[in-house]
Amino acid sequence: MALENKLGLISSADLAREEERLSKKKAVELFENGVLDALPAGKFSTLQAIHKYLFEDIYDFAGKLRTVNLAKGNFRFAPLIYLEAALANIDKMPQSTFDEIIEKYVEMNIAHPFREGNGRSTRIWLDHILKTEIGKVVNWSKVDKEDYLLAMERSPIKDVEIKVLLKGALTDEINSREVYMLGIDHSYYYEGYTTFKTEEL
């Protein structure tokens, strides 16, 4: 059974396909229209704007805080009663070095503020901080899926693995269309979305 959506789709497979197609097109627009350039790096309000932009054609909850508790495997994301306080604290975290930025990213992943689409929107948010603060972005096509997922799974306890992994994939090609497009495809691949190539939409 599919998540409730604006498209009236009942099949999970149909929804996954349309979600990938529509939100990847919106991700391309984000790059091309420079919307992010006007938004403050590292703030939850910016992540909200990214999430809303990507998913507003698909879900009513786009850009809105989740209203349910979420878990993945044995890991529980921030409980609803603490979510707003957690996000306020994340806003205040420093972000002047690579390590500080990744620590902030790890905390936002633990917060998992949305019902769906957290990983994809938060990776764009992370690159926006890296680009603004240290003049780098992650070349996600260089980050192995299994290594990334395992490092993120461990990151709440030990963040050294995700730091090493992402540091090795940093590039100063911050305005490269190719790096961005391949990065979106890879970001979606981590979540199991592989039907469409971003560059061809």
What is each of the regions a protein language model found here?
Residues M1-L201:
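FIC/Doc superfamily catalytic core
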